[in-house]
Amino acid sequence: MRAPVSFDPFRRYWRIYGGWKALLTSPYFHLAVILTAVCYPLWSKAGTESADLAISVIPSVMAFSLGGMAIVLAFSGGRFLTVIRQGGDDASLFMTVIANFFHFLVIQTLALISALVALSFPKLLVPSGVAFFFLAYSVTAAIASAASLFNVSRIYNVVGDDENQS
């Protein structure tokens, strides 16, 4: 049985991103696990401090993500787009960068949702730990997204864009 059409973008993103293997071998994921363990004293206290932190930080990080995606899409024209589309392949650099930003937004959304759950249950340790992990993963994944933008900009620097050259 096939998943509903509304899940198709998620299926495609997950495949292009690399699935569970890419997630579980990601150094950014590992760093988030380490940060969550090291910061145990911060998120394990009864109360809502770590959830409040996530709710105050994540919207700004989401804006960075959407801005980064907008930059990639804005520069996606002419010769540059032809080069990074790699013949329309699903695994092209263009689709990989977009999938990375999509992943970044999924992580941030999970961070926000888990922070709201942690706020609802301030005396429970697990929701607070999960919320902190997704916050940490959002922050570490910001580095990965910035690296994707940097790589795309290096290609743009070499290839340029016929439409912008007179």
Model regions: which residues?
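N-terminal juxtamembrane cytosolic/stromal segments of multi-pass membrane proteins
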Residues: M1-I34
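Short membrane-interface loop/juxtamembrane segments of multi-pass integral membrane proteins
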Residues: L81-N100
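Alpha-helical transmembrane segments
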Residues: S50-L66, L135
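Alpha-helical transmembrane segments and their membrane-interface junctions
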Residues: A37-Y40, L105-S128
